[in-house]
Amino acid sequence: MRTERDDSTVDALNELLRGELSAVESYDKALPAVEDKPALRSDLQECRASHEARVERIRRAIEQVGGEPARASGAWGLFAKAVAGGARALGWKTVVSTLEEGEDHGLKEYKDALPRLDEGLRHLVSSELYPQQQRTHSVMSALKRVASA
């Protein structure tokens, strides 16, 4: 039987998992908007792959502590739902800006989760997952600056 602390850890991990699922969905919906921009498409595919890898890593961590991984996406999945089929109509600059906002939200989610995790999982997040989130955020921030220029 899990303790209250374990439940808090599982809850925090599931929040991160939902955010990562949302990110993957969002990138899937955004990619059609950049079909004619190979370099930008490559950057978005790389960010999507990073989020997908984090989905798998967080799922494993949840299972290792005896939890049930979330299956539904979280808050920034709203982007994916909002642009379902319409990313091309938004234009690539709007898509990049929106993805950067999602990446920013992801940074906050990771920071907020840290105090609720046990020591081992805190290390996983701070040394592996959070740096990956910082990287995808940096990529999207740089692309947003280019889009704004």
Regions found by a protein language model. Name each.
Residues M1-D11, R60-I62, G85-G91, R145:
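Short, charged, low-complexity loops and linkers
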Residues R2-D36, K93-R116:
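Alpha-helical bundle segments that constitute or directly flank the non-heme di-iron/ferroxidase center
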Residues S8-L16, D36-E56, W92-V96, L121-Q134:
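Alpha-helical scaffold segments that form or flank carboxylate-/histidine-based iron centers
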Residues L21-D28, E52-R59, L107, K111, ...:
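Structural signal for well-ordered, non-membrane alpha-helices
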Residues P32, A49, G77-A80, Y130:
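Short amphipathic alpha-helical surface patches that mediate protein-protein
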Residues P38-A75, V139-A147:
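Conserved alpha-helical segments that form or flank metal/cofactor-binding pockets of metalloenzymes
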Residues E56-T94, T98-L107:
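Carboxylate-rich helix-loop segments that flank metal/cofactor sites and access channels
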Residues G102-A149:
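Preference for long, well-ordered alpha-helical segments
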